[in-house]
Amino acid sequence: MKKLIWLFVFAFMPLVIFSQRNADYGVFGGVASYFGDINTNKILYSPRPAAGVFYRYNLHQRHSLRANLFAGGLSANDADFNNSFQQNRAASFSGMVAEMVLQFEFNFFPYSTDGKKWNSTPYFAGGIGGAFIDTKEVAVIPVIPFSFGFKINIKRNIGLEAEYGFRKTFYDNFDGLESYPYAWTHNNDWYTFTGICVTWKFYKLAGCPAYNDVDSKRKR
């Protein structure tokens, strides 16, 4: 886990230092939930508190790179489901997940937190990452993160976002159970993060003509 953290820091330190003008910083608050052999189909099942921080480098008003550090609780119990198989199995677990992921983010409309107030757009993101799992066992696993949401610029340099993110893992032991043959998750466990993000810029530097090209055309 420590090696992943240091790799994360060194990979993005140059962007943080030299790219302030096009950078957003954010905090996330919401819930985490689990899909797997116990919960095969319920969205937002057994939600547990989750929080995180992220750094976004805006390549363009439609394209960004985003680095997340999120963590949240996970739990599930067969007693929550009304079928005889799960009632007899009586499996359960609780624990946590902490992740570091890099995503490419696409805005459906041009968006910037240093431009017009109430600028808004839906967005989608996908990428790669790793997660530290502590449930039935402790493990570090690769994940493929996907997210979609809606963002709005509520004040100059400040944005608000609502996001649902789901993580495909290559791991089947969140719950300590052998694969359930009919699970839609294809025998690997998944987890999700759902919540609200607040983003901001610490300060504003001189604008970049290439970055502002789309916004200037819209104002003509």
Language model regions located:
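Short glycine/proline- and aromatic-enriched beta-strand/turn motifs that initiate or cap beta-hairpins
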Residues: 19-56, 199-205, 220
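Residues on the lipid-exposed face of transmembrane beta-strands in outer-membrane beta-barrel proteins
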Residues: 27-31, 53-57, 102-106, 126-130, ...
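Predominantly the C-terminal beta-signal and adjacent terminal strand-loop region
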Residues: 78-79, 154-220
